[in-house]
Regions:
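Short pre-active-site segment immediately N-terminal to the catalytic Zn-binding motif
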Residues: 64-81
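Short amphipathic alpha-helical segments
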Residues: 1, 61-65
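Long, well-structured alpha-helical subdomains associated
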Residues: 124-152
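Post-HEXXH active-site segment of zinc metalloproteases
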Residues: 75-79, 91-122
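Short active-site segment of divalent metal-dependent hydrolases/proteases
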Residues: 82-90
Length: 152
């Protein structure tokens, strides 16, 4: 896999970066995209002050995912990564060809883009949830083995 994660913020995101590195192959397999994306973590303090500010976006021209990280829980950031990777899959499948620039409210005014957003919300959340559950089950099994080893 040839994807990159670049932290352009001043935050220590090593734990988050590790989670994305674990999640990405799972997402690629389950979403089915055939080209790798680049993921950028960005800081925007003005945006973070806005309770309805941007959380992330996908750029189909350079196959990049940009995630705003200020003041956000890692799990929320992971959901954004998953959502934007669905858009990446849509782009790899040619579903974002010739859509033109998006504007505020595009998901409410353009029925096709509304469908793309619905797909990203649904699949993004489900793929992330499935990965999270699988990861948690593995951790529980590891803890059980460790407890049994301690008893012996």
């Amino acid at each position: 896999m040839n994807f990159n994660i670049k932290n352009n913020s001043s935050h220590d995101l090593s734990q988050l970066t590790n989670l994305v590195r674990e999640f990405y192959p799972y997402a690629k397999k389950h979403m089915g995209f055939n080209r790798d994306a680049n993921i950028f973590f960005e800081s925007d303090l003005q945006n973070a002050k806005n309770p309805l500010g941007k959380t992330a976006y996908y750029n189909p021209e350079d196959f990049s995912v940009t995630i705003y990280v200020d003041g956000r829980h890692p799990k929320d950031i992971m959901r954004s990564v998953s959502h934007e990777l669905v858009h990446h899959h849509q782009n790899c499948d040619g579903k974002l060809d010739n859509i033109g620039p998006t504007h505020e409210g595009y998901a409410q005014s353009d029925t096709y883009l509304r469908e793309m957003e619905e797909d990203a919300y649904k699949r993004g959340n489900l793929v992330f949830r499935d990965w999270e559950n699988q990861k948690n089950i593995k951790e529980i099994r590891k803890m059980k083995v460790t407890k049994e080893e301690l008893k012996n």
